[in-house]
Amino acid sequence: MLKPHGLTPLALTGGILVSLLSVSLSAHAEIATDVATTGWATQNGGTKGGSRAAANNIYTVKNAAELKAALAASGGSNGRIIKERGVIDVSDGKPYTKTSDMKQRARLDIPGKTTIVGTSSSAEIREGFFYAKENDVIIRNLTIENPWDPEPVWDPEDGSAGNWNSEYDGLTVEGASNVWIDHVTFTDGRRTDDQNGTANGRPKQHHDGALDVKNGANYVTISYSVFRNHEKNNLIGSSDSKTPDDGKLKVTNHNSLFENISSRGPRVRVGQVHLYNNHHIGSTTHKVYPCVYAQGVGKGSKIFSERNVLDISGISGCSKVAADYGGSVYRDSGSLVNGSVISCSWSTSIGWTPPYSYTPLAADKVAADVKAKAGAGKI
């Protein structure tokens, strides 16, 4: 049964145990009530999620039924906090047989004014995918195993040889404003792409994206997060012809790890996107997730890349650092590629300046900082 802010009574003996419990609960409370302090999510009135939720709108969940009930419950004027414990299998152990079945059972819609926070390093969502389509959402300290579509579709027009494509991303931010994604780990997890076999002469791809921001989404910060073992990672802007995106898709990603990511780290259309102090690790010859490119510069994008570090074997120039997908505005400052300073700027001016305060680390400090602090369980 779902219980708002319910804690199981414990028979405590000894002042030390009581003290430790008090400290733990205090730290946990601070995590759940934090608001965004960096990047684009601080603008437009800020991102508060459910930080001011009333006690009866704070839920602790440990299975799919409780999670879905907490998301569906009335949040009140100050929203809700959902504290996620352990591994939640959204399928309840019943494998999805069709894409339509997955759409019905795996989708997790996040209401506005919601904070979702993992209570420990073991907090993880499997066999499900989040949709944030309402404003003011915070997700922190959580691992999301990227969803596995049981029915990939063959598209003979995708690329020179055709490709298999699938539905559903680990998290989709669609049309929502003010979203903060912090210390979240996205990974293919138990189902890496080398397990899928081939058909029509091409790898059969059961994954789509890890994190997509699209359809007029705005004021989004991704901080100290991890993207690991995935092909098409982070899309910002889903179409060259989406006019609702004009003037929107303002996104910051900082101090995050991209490890064995083939592409889209991120791939941007239209948006004013600030990428700083991120660490990319990989290889162009990786057997499962070879690096094709790091950042994709798409139509109308205005990317400011700053003091990022790319340790990707096989990269020697800018074509795989900032790949041309129809864009023309790209500025880089102080980034390192395999230990060397490299200037990959296409433009001296990008037409905008970050309106928020921030202090980027020197590039030679980035790898250690990201290793120590990024991802679920390091908050």
UniProtKB/Swiss-Prot annotation:
PANTHER family assigned: PECTATE LYASE 18-RELATED, PECTATE LYASE 21-RELATED
Organism: Pseudomonas amygdali pv. lachrymans
Biological process per Gene Ontology, one example term: pectin catabolic process
Free-text function comment from the UniProt entry: Plays a role in bacterial invasion of plants.
Secretion signal, residue range per the UniProt entry: 1-29
Necessary cofactors: Ca(2+)
Lineage: Bacteria, Pseudomonadati, Pseudomonadota, Gammaproteobacteria, Pseudomonadales
Descriptive protein name: Pectate lyase
Listed pathway(s): Glycan metabolism; pectin degradation; 2-dehydro-3-deoxy-D-gluconate from pectin: step 2/5
A single GO cellular-component term on record: extracellular region
GO molecular function, one term: metal ion binding
Cofactor binding note from Swiss-Prot or TrEMBL: Binds 1 Ca(2+) ion per subunit.
This protein's UniProt keywords: Calcium, Lyase, Metal-binding, Secreted, Signal
Disulphide-bonded residues: none
